[in-house]
Amino acid sequence: GMQTLMYSASFFEDDEDEKKKKEAMTQEERKAQEEKEKKQEKAMMGGTVAFSIVFALGLFFFLPYFLSGIFHKVISSDTVIALLEGLIRLAIFIGYIALISLTPDIKRVFMYHGAEHKCINCIEHGMELNVENVRKSSRQHKRCGTSFLLIVMLISIVFFLFIRVDSRILQLVLRLLLIPVIAGVSYEFIRLAGRYDNRLVNILSKPGLWMQKMTTKEPDDEMIEVGIASVEAVFDWRKWQKEENV
């Protein structure tokens, strides 16, 4: 994901001063400059990824754990504390999404997110991929990453209920070790939700679809056109519709 963002950012034109500097360089100097920029880009990418992981773990796993621990003095049940931890985690997650959605740039990203969902829903419902059909399609989708993250939060409550050790350090270590397992179970649920369309699956998918009302916004026609171009660059949707008989 970071590599794709960096690649996208590379298409922004340099300012006039930068252009003049590069034009004045010899071929060897230009090559050395490009190598330097690549190294800086890799370092920036590594630092960003590392910070993102630490930030996410701190905000969504460690902070709820320590906040729920405050109630140990008044609540003796480990089960209730674990449930409280899960509720705090959900509240932080929803609050975080609500907060970042107030910024203009993120709101615009969410509009593109909505355009992406609309394009996929348009194809999966057997319609021609054009602006008019995409516009009237739903901006919510069962296989969305937002649904995945919410399911991770919910399933983690169940898994963490079974951590019954006294050491707080060991409790944190076990939580970290369970993250890949929780992510795997959540991924399989998302796949199941995308494959089947029955009442039980639809009910279980509702929380994720509700969250998508926050992480997707109605796109304008230009954004829809970008979404269509992106889909067509990735796969042959007409061939897919024929193969799937949709």
What are these regions (language model features)?
Residues G1-D17:
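Extended, hydrophilic extramembrane loops/domains of integral membrane proteins
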Residues S8, F60-P64, S68, F93-T103, ...:
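Alpha-helical transmembrane segments of polytopic integral membrane proteins
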Residues F11, S52-S77, V152-L174, P180-A183, ...:
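Juxtamembrane "helix exit" motif at the C-terminal ends of alpha-helical transmembrane segments
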Residues F12, K19, E23-L102:
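Hydrophobic alpha-helical segments characteristic of transmembrane helices
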Residues R30-E37, S68-L84, I163-V173, L192-N202, ...:
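Membrane interface segments of multi-pass transport proteins and intramembrane proteases
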Residues T79, L83-L90, G95-S147, L192-Y196, ...:
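Polar-ligand-bearing catalytic/cofactor-coordination segments
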Residues L83-L87, L150, V173-L177:
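Hydrophobic alpha-helical transmembrane segments
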